[in-house]
Design a protein with these regions (language model features):
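Compositionally biased terminal segments of proteins
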Residues: 1-150
Length: 150
């Protein structure tokens, strides 16, 4: 399983400025603000990375835009608490599986099936929630292919 964090944000201009302040360039690779603005302007699937320089740990930031899959997944996000002060919301595993299936279809990287198998083993996947999206996105055969892999 890859060691990165996928984050979906509804990022307006004010939040963009706060995001840039929260990740100092001395500690993180942060793309130039103009790149983030370009990604914000894309109607679907705007994306950029944040990388912690010391550890190499990466966050893939996906912007909601008008993507119907994001609109579906946002209310289903799961809230996690770390200590008393930190709460984050994470995407449902079905959303992550759908995105990884899309990326696998586009590039056939072996990491995506491995990640999908790990998600199925660790968190499980609600196939009744997944099936309509698999059909809508034309991913049903890839899903079956990955499920049948050893």
């Amino acid at each position: 399983m890859t060691n990165d964090l996928d984050v979906v944000l509804n990022l307006d201009d004010r939040a963009r400025h706060a995001l840039l302040k929260a990740f100092p360039e001395a500690e993180f690779y942060v793309p130039p603000e103009s790149v983030i603005q370009t990604e914000q302007a894309r109607p679907q699937r705007g994306h950029f990375n944040l990388i912690h320089l010391e550890s190499g740990y990466k966050a893939d930031i996906y912007l909601t835009g008008s993507d119907p899959l994001h609109a579906w997944a946002m209310p289903l996000r799961r809230r996690l608490h770390w200590g008393d002060r930190l709460e984050i919301a994470v995407a449902p595993p079905e959303y992550v599986v759908l995105r990884k299936l899309e990326y696998y279809r586009e590039g056939h990287s072996a990491k995506h099936p491995a990640d999908i198998r790990a998600i199925r083993e660790v968190t499980g996947v609600d196939e009744s929630a997944l099936t309509p999206w698999l059909e809508r996105m034309g991913l049903s055969s890839l899903w079956q292919e990955i499920k049948s892999m050893p």
